[in-house]
């Protein structure tokens, strides 16, 4: 093609009109001859296609950011272009992102982060001394006294020490070893990392991972990615989403026919279900794990989000140690926490940690090796995690303001949890269990037979159809229960309770009006 074009250009010099035409004609003929000799080749097949890609990645689904969220993005763009809708904004109630919903950051955390990010501010009188003290300690532990340097793969040493001290305080003196602490890119990174080490075997010896249904879709996504076997155990919706050990026994016995159940995942407080497990339940689960030789994963990122006066958070680590050495020396446990939830709501920093106990020394080396492949978690996220576990204490300059802000966030969440539960339960065809903790409602919804048929005609799950209609008619984005798992024949959706109270009231009223109209339309 390049040669042909050059031949055509040759005829463009200064010539008489007649000679120019003959020259152009001659050049064009020669170019045509070249093209006949070297025909343009068709584009070759792409190396990476849906057929050739990693099938485990293709099997991954993550409902929290799935099709309905993509549709919400499309609608937002349409609103920006001036396309008329029955609403003026999309309310993203699909995800637990507190600050995106208007929650203000905790002042002390942002002060320390500002000081760590721009150390020249350490000379400013505008910052309290306790914030400066923490910032200096973090920076002194970083290479070059900068958050911009890599840390050790396991995390900054002094931050791991602070995490261990926090766990010891939280658990009433039960010791925590900094060497068992691994700082992570959010809790999700820790969960996927530990599962990578746990999954092995093939055929009937392939690792089975027990997860609650409903579950947080991270678990099913990682299980698919690792080509492990998902083993479902169902929470008891009729008993406030309680975990029943008899259901665990059923699940593990049935799974042994086709896999090797090796891992038991617990989410406490529950996501999406909002239940808080009793101490007795946790003891029963630990005994079951010991009995069946299961590795326990305790997802405890909502440990500060407990609202019911009748409930209290009990860490698996604390209960395990209080059950005595037969359990505390033998049951392998990884527990997880994060900067994203609680009262801090710092999702964007991607800070987290995992504590892993009773790990074989040789496996600990393998875990550190795996972590070293990604070098280290974001050092800014590690710093944010430090402030979560090492906040101001009584007698420090920032303590009163910090306490007010913390109590305000958690108090408002408790009010919104009760408001959501009460208003949903006033709507015919909606039932919502008590929201004991976390930051979501997971109401059960009645979907008429005609709506189920309409959903099938659109090749959608009935609750996806319901949630899509809710989005298109009200602008409210929630996640269908089918994305979390649910018992056959039941339908739910997950909705965050994070919007400000007045906006939450508006959301709940819109859901109520939509649901009543939906029932009438498909009666």
Curated annotation (Swiss-Prot):
Modified-residue entries (N6-(pyridoxal phosphate)lysine), positions: 341
The record's section on CDD domains has:
AAT_like (cd00609)
Which BP terms does GO give this entry? Answer: 2-oxoglutarate metabolic process; biosynthetic process; L-alanine catabolic process; L-alanine metabolic process
Q: What is its EC number?
A: 2.6.1.2
Stretch list, region Disordered: 1-25
Q: In which tissues is it expressed?
A: Expressed at high levels in muscle, adipose tissue, kidney and brain and at lower levels in the liver and breast.
Assigned keywords, A-Z: Acetylation, Aminotransferase, Disease variant, Intellectual disability, Pyridoxal phosphate, Transferase
Q: Can you list the GO cellular component terms from the UniProt entry?
A: mitochondrial matrix; mitochondrion
What are its cofactors?
Answer: pyridoxal 5'-phosphate
In this entry, which stretches build a coiled coil? none
Part of which pathway? Amino-acid degradation; L-alanine degradation via transaminase pathway; pyruvate from L-alanine: step 1/1
User: Any idea which residues bear N6-acetyllysine here?
Assistant: 415, 505, 512
Q: Name one GO molecular function term.
A: L-alanine:2-oxoglutarate aminotransferase activity
Keyword Transferase in annotation: yes
Reactions catalysed, as given in the entry: L-alanine + 2-oxoglutarate = pyruvate + L-glutamate
User: What enzyme class is recorded for this protein?
Assistant: transferase
Note the Pfam families from the entry: Aminotran_1_2
InterPro entries per record: ALAT1/2-like, Aminotransferase_I/II_large, PyrdxlP-dep_Trfase, PyrdxlP-dep_Trfase_major, PyrdxlP-dep_Trfase_small
| Connected disease | Neurodevelopmental disorder with spastic paraplegia and microcephaly: An autosomal recessive syndrome characterized by severe psychomotor developmental delay, dysarthria, walking difficulties, moderately to severely impaired intellectual development, poor or absent speech, and progressive microcephaly.
Subunit annotation: Homodimer.
Can you tell me which family this protein belongs to?
Belongs to the class-I pyridoxal-phosphate-dependent aminotransferase family. Alanine aminotransferase subfamily.
What this chain does, per the entry, is described as: Catalyzes the reversible transamination between alanine and 2-oxoglutarate to form pyruvate and glutamate.
Name it: Alanine aminotransferase 2
Upper taxonomic lineage: Eukaryota, Metazoa, Chordata, Craniata, Vertebrata
Gene it is expressed from: GPT2
């Amino acid at each position: 093609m390049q040669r042909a074009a050059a031949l055509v250009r040759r005829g463009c010099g200064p010539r008489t009109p007649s000679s120019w035409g003959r020259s152009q004609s001659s050049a064009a003929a020669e170019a045509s001859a070249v093209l006949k000799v070297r025909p343009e080749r068709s584009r070759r097949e792409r190396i990476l296609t849906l057929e050739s890609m990693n099938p485990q990645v293709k099997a991954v689904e993550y409902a929290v950011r799935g099709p309905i969220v993509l549709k919400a993005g499309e609608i937002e763009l349409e609103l920006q272009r001036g396309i008329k809708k029955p609403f003026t904004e999309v309310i993203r109630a699909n995800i637990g992102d507190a600050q995106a919903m208007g929650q203000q950051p905790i002042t002390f955390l942002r002060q320390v982060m500002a000081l760590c990010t721009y150390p020249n501010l350490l000379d400013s009188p505008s910052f309290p001394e306790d914030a400066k003290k923490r910032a200096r300690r973090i920076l002194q532990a970083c290479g070059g006294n900068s958050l911009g340097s890599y840390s050790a793969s396991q995390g900054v040493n002094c931050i791991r020490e602070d995490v261990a001290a926090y766990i010891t305080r939280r658990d009433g003196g039960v010791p925590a070893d900094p060497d068992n602490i691994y700082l992570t890119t959010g809790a999700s990174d820790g969960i996927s990392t530990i599962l990578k080490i746990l999954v092995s075997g093939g055929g009937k010896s392939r690792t089975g991972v027990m997860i609650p249904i409903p579950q947080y879709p991270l678990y099913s996504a990682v299980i698919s990615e690792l080509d492990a076997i998902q083993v479902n155990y169902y929470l008891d919706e009729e008993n406030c989403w309680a975990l029943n050990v008899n259901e665990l026994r059923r699940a593990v016995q049935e799974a042994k026919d086709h896999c090797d159940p090796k891992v038991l995942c617990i989410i406490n407080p529950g996501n999406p279900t909002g239940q808080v497990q009793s101490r007795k339940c946790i003891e029963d689960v630990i005994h079951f794990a010991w009995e069946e030789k299961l590795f326990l994963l305790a997802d405890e990122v909502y440990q500060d989000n407990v609202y019911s006066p009748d409930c209290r958070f009990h860490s698996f680590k604390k209960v395990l140690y209080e059950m005595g050495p037969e359990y505390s020396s033998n049951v392998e446990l990884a527990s997880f926490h994060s900067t994203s939830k609680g009262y801090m709501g710092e999702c964007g920093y991607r800070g987290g940690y995992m504590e892993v106990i009773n790990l074989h020394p040789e496996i600990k080396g393998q875990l550190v090796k795996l972590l070293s492949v990604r070098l280290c978690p974001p050092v800014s996220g590690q710093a944010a995690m430090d402030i979560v576990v090492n906040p101001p204490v009584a007698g420090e300059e920032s303590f009163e303001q910090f306490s007010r802000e913390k109590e305000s966030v958690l108090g408002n969440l408790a009010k919104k949890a009760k408001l959501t539960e009460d208003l949903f339960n006033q709507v015919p065809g909606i039932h919502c269990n008590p929201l004991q903790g976390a930051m979501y409602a997971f109401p059960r919804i009645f979907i008429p037979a005609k709506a189920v048929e309409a959903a099938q005609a659109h090749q959608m799950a009935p609750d996806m159809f319901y949630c899509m209609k809710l989005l298109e008619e009200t602008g409210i984005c929630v996640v269908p229960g089918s994305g979390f798992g649910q018992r056959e024949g039941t339908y739910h959706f997950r909705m965050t309770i994070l919007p400000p109270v007045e906006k939450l009231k508006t959301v709940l009223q819109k859901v109520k009006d939509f649901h009543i109209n939906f029932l009438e339309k498909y009666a």
